[in-house]
């Protein structure tokens, strides 16, 4: 990693632990900062805080005392999930204290070039595809960021022979200043996380931070299926490389079942190892990045053909007596579920849907669920999802939790059918995150097979 001294002897407050906060605290300590960690979880239930204290880092737990900011901190590094409406952050900003996320730290110390991937849907799959293609080509793609490996941790071990492939959320990108990837990808932009950002325009602005420091020597890969992406091309200094499944573009595109890059066939769409039109888009974005990094077509084709998907992203789980189970727990919004359904014959699908109620109706989903064999509906949003099912003329049953839903879906399915967990909702009404929800689905499928 690069040795930098801008944090040496500077007082830094790390707000919120989890993986990213813990990693940031250790990195800042290593860089010579005077670190204070503040986390809401009580000390006795906080193994991360206990470990940091043993390492000599000051920790304050069990709440977020505003008087803590009476100290003269030079910087705050916050957990991405903590909203800017948090009183601690509001006070820090009012005092002129810069508020960053650990992504900024990762950029500052990384010896490796950075490829950043953001968007509303497809981030994790595209990040993983890019990482695997680059690694197959000998460029060693190191996955980091929102994909589960703290960027500031991975950046410490990355050399200039590696490539840091970073999945970036809007939450993370709100806290960057100098962050400068060589290539950035925006998979798509849809109205999500409005409860955090306040409006769609603010959400888009957060995503757009990914390109703030890019120049004409850098590449910004955009989804030209969306007019919004086309409109944004005039607002960046970066060189835009488009991808599209709807039209021929000066980049990566789909035509007559083939995936092209600037007029050259790379592979057939039906050779991609995972189903669904959304994965064609993900593959096109990956092809664009790979070609910009001079990866040969054969390596791209072999890697994407062998690609088995990502856990919780349209993940094939098992086959029980001819019934296939797919875990798409990461589908936390309507678009993601629409994309998932596009890969299947609706008449053979039993869909499990519902979760956190964010107040939105599901009318947009009606055309996509029309013709489903059955639905199993659960969660806070159940009444809203049921209204959409009624409009689509789809019969449904209700479930109390994911295990119950999985069992009921299997009972409704017959040989040749698909049980698809694609909730179109976040998990937080019942579960800590979509991973917990997906793991419970996987565990229940395993029990059904016994």
UniProtKB/Swiss-Prot annotation:
One GO biological process term is:
cell division
Q: Report the locations given in the UniProt record.
A: Cytoplasm
Top-level enzyme category: ligase
| Reaction catalysed by this enzyme | UDP-N-acetyl-alpha-D-muramoyl-L-alanine + D-glutamate + ATP = UDP-N-acetyl-alpha-D-muramoyl-L-alanyl-D-glutamate + ADP + phosphate + H(+)
Listed binding positions for ATP are: 119-125
Q: Which GO terms describe its molecular function?
A: ATP binding; UDP-N-acetylmuramoylalanine-D-glutamate ligase activity
UniProt keyword Cytoplasm present: yes
Q: What is its EC number?
A: 6.3.2.9
Keywords from UniProt, A to Z, are: ATP-binding, Cell cycle, Cell division, Cell shape, Cell wall biogenesis/degradation, Cytoplasm, Ligase, Nucleotide-binding, Peptidoglycan synthesis
Q: Part of which pathway? A: Cell wall biogenesis; peptidoglycan biosynthesis
Mainly resides where?
cytoplasm
Entry keyword annotation includes Aminoacyl-tRNA synthetase: no
Q: Which GO terms describe its cellular component?
A: cytoplasm
> What PANTHER family would the database entry show?
UDP-N-ACETYLMURAMOYLALANINE--D-GLUTAMATE LIGASE (PTHR43692:SF1)
Looking up NCBIfam families in the UniProt record yields: murD
UniProt function note = Cell wall formation. Catalyzes the addition of glutamate to the nucleotide precursor UDP-N-acetylmuramoyl-L-alanine (UMA).
Task: Give the similarity note.
Answer: Belongs to the MurCDEF family.
- Protein name per its UniProtKB record: UDP-N-acetylmuramoylalanine--D-glutamate ligase
Naturally occurring in which organism (per UniProt) = Streptococcus pneumoniae (strain ATCC 700669 / Spain 23F-1)
């Amino acid at each position: 990693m690069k040795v930098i001294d801008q944090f040496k002897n500077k007082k830094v407050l790390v707000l919120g632990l989890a993986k990213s906060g813990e990693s940031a605290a250790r990195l800042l300590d290593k860089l010579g900062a005077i670190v204070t960690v503040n986390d809401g979880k009580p000390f006795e239930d906080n193994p991360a805080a206990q470990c940091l204290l043993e390492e000599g880092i000051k920790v304050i737990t069990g709440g977020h005392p505003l008087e803590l900011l009476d100290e003269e901190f030079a910087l705050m590094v916050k957990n991405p999930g903590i909203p800017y409406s948090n009183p601690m952050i509001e006070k820090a900003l009012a005092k002129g204290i810069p508020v960053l996320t650990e992504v900024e730290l990762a950029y500052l110390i990384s010896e490796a070039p950075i490829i950043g991937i953001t968007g509303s849907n497809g981030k994790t799959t595209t990040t993983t595809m890019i990482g695997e293609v680059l690694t197959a080509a000998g460029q060693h793609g190191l996955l980091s960021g929102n994909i589960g490996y703290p960027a500031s941790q991975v950046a410490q071990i990355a050399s200039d022979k590696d490539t840091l492939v970073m999945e970036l959320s809007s939450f993370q990108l709100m806290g960057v200043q100098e962050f400068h990837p060589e290539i950035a990808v925006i998979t798509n932009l849809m109205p999500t996380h409005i409860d955090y950002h306040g409006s769609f325009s603010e959400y888009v602005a957060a995503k757009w931070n990914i390109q703030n420091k890019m120049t004409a020597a850098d590449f910004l890969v955009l989804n030209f299926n969306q007019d919004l992406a086309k409109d944004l091309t005039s607002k960046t200094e970066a060189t835009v490389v488009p991808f599209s499944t709807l039209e021929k573009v000066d980049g990566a595109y789909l035509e007559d079942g083939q995936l092209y890059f600037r007029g050259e066939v790379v592979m057939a769409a039906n050779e991609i190892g995972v189903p669904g039109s959304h994965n064609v888009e993900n593959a096109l974005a990956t092809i664009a990045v790979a070609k910009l990094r001079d990866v040969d077509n054969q390596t791209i084709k072999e890697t994407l053909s062998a690609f088995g998907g990502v856990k919780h992203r349209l993940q094939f789980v098992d086959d029980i007596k001819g019934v296939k189970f797919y875990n798409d727990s990461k589908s936390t919004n309507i678009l993601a579920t629409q994309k998932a359904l596009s890969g299947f014959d609706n008449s053979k699908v039993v869909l499990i849907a519902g979760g956190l109620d964010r107040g939105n109706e599901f009318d947009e989903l009606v055309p996509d669920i029309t013709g489903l064999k059955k639905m199993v509906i659960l969660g806070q949003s159940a009444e809203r999802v049921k209204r959409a099912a009624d409009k689509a003329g789809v019969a449904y049953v209700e479930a109390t939790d994911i295990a119950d839903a999985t069992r009921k879906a299997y009972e409704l399915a017959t040989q040749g059918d698909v049980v698809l967990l694609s909730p179109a909702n976040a998990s937080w009404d019942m579960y800590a995150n979509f991973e917990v929800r997906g793991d419970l689905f996987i565990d229940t499928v395993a029990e059904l097979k016994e």
